[in-house]
Amino acid sequence: MAQAQQTNLMPVPTSVSLNKENYRLTDNFTIKITGLADKRLYKEASRFMQRLSEKTGLFFKTWEIPNVSHNPSAALKIHSIKKGVVQLDMEESYTLSVDNSEIKINAASDIGAIRGLETLLQLVESDPNGFYFQGAYISDNPRFAWRGLLLSQPYHFMPMDVIKRTLDAMAMVKMNVFHFYISDDQGYTIESKVFPTLHEKASGGNYFTHVQVAEIIEYADQRGIRVIPEIDLPGHSTAILTAFPELASNKRTYTLQDHWGVFDPTINPTQESTYVFLNTLLSEVASLFPDHYFHIGGDENTGNDWAKNQSIQAFMKKEGLQDAVALQNYFNKRIQKILKRSNKTIVGWDEILMKKMDDAKAKEYFEKGELDQLIETKVPKDIVVQSWRGIEALLASAKNGYKSILSKGYYIDLVQPTYYHYLNDPIPFLNKVIVPDSEANFNRFESEIIKKIQNGERILSPQEEKLIIGGEATMWTEHVSPETIDSRLWPRTAAIAERLWSPENIRDVDDMYRRLDIISIQLEWLGSTHIKNKQMMLRRLARTEDINVLENVVDYIEPVKGYKRNNANNFTKYSPYSLLVDVAAPDPSSLRKFNKLLDTLIINPSDILLEKLYQQLYLWDSNHDIIQKMAYKNLLLKDLLTHSTSLQVISSRSIELLNLKKKGLAASPEQIKQYKDLIKKSLVPAGYCELSLGLNLEKFILDYCQK
């Protein structure tokens, strides 16, 4: 079992055997590379030396790794059998051995060797005598070939420095697909030399040049990461239609959208000029991205503009296309032919495969196991389906011979707790914890198949399971800025990376959180701003450098989960994303540890643990007066004051009930009712933030005090 010995590694390797033969680090540490390797390995080995120097404070003579094989005294010997190619099913396996005399990394390709270097950096430990690599033998390879992260550009543009530090973090946790979401209703974000009007009119001034795109691809390739572009078609196309309104299905004035949601503007799929335009544009974009896969979107087409266009309706009747889904399939096939000429395989959201039907009919087919009834059978098999709406799309894809990747349950922009993502497995048999998302209606119905999965039954055959090639976390940027995006990405995405890399039996949530706290700090060392920006933003919010008392509140609240912020409909592209909700971190470590304390107290209400609880409650009680004074002249602290008030009230009442228990007295029914009412009131969100700890606090206090 990979988790039999406790390590700090994330993701957990396939096989780990620790030993006490630690390798002591000195200034003389050097690296030797042998075998066949691309230049990327030499660059990454040099970067490894720099990071190791920064981590240990050691003064190495050089960070550069010469492209020569002679260096018999090298401490780290890396051997690569072949030069790797960054593509689907790239060879990423490696073995790593550390003893007191040397370190060896042997890999099938230089990409595997790079994965081994990341593991080795996580083995650095220290004691009073200095730094060392933990003695170990590791054999490792990924469980899934597709381990991705989507980053959308049109909503809030993320500049080059954000992309590069995101790629650095992805490489650290062994993710290997960067999904570059280029276009939507809010913008088209790369330069077009064949249609310069596109980036001139439809980017809002925010776009990457061809040179910058090449820089991103090279940066990713060095780290063993594929870059896959997405141009969302035929819906989500307001930006394209702003530049080229003659391609639209409906005559109207088109301007870039600055709100969030699903809109009607749709490309006209019935006119040949559309395909002339898309042939030229997609061929240009395809030439920029060397990966064999190209994402065409295909999601959330309302069909409204098609329904209103008499010419489109006449075309559908002539071609025997019964509905908007059939027309979109016609469009997709035309796009597929265009991209095939560029040697591309299309990827699309699950709408490109699934039939449109009411929930009752879908439930009937799903419960009967007639999954072929859920899909459009005329869709070519050589596509990849990205499942975002529910497990039925994933199952139907695999059952009918389509490759698929899972994103449902990996929407990190919805700020769900880390365990929610961690326990969400791409293989349905293992997806025993299927968490319905009531905001998104991802699970549209309960069924016997869902119950079978939750009971651990296999729904797919081994061959069908192989068609599920991985998963992809999605970072939709409606409610983030370059300043806040890291706090939404990290460290939670590291847990998704582990789910996609590590063996299926690695599911210990407590141990995941233990290691996540460690990896979080290491991600900051690498350049992630998820920790330091939170403090900077809180200082700005408070207009002072003294933020300790504010942190005592902010560290225990969370942004509202799911689509609650989207549904408020008062945020746009130009709204401030520097408010309390933007400062608050998803699944904060302090809140988790407080809840863990309460869980432990229910089992073992020892004096030591009770004292810890008292200290925290006293802190919130006494903290409030200071915050009240700070908020008096600062309206930006209004929502924080609301949460501080809740904490002060429930803390003081909790102390009262605990003191009664200490005196051997019982709380009256009226006191219990008042306490419950206060807890309930504290759960009401303020400033799009929620204070959820009251539920666990109430559970312990009432359980303990009524015994």
Identify the meaning behind each predicted range.
Residues K83-H295, N309, R334, I338, ...:
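Feature activates predominantly on carbohydrate-active enzymes
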Residues F263-V384, W388-A396:
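Active-site neighborhood of glycoside hydrolase catalytic domains
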Residues M354-M357, E364-K381, Q386-T529, I602-I608, ...:
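Conserved alpha/beta catalytic core and glycan-binding cleft of carbohydrate-active enzymes
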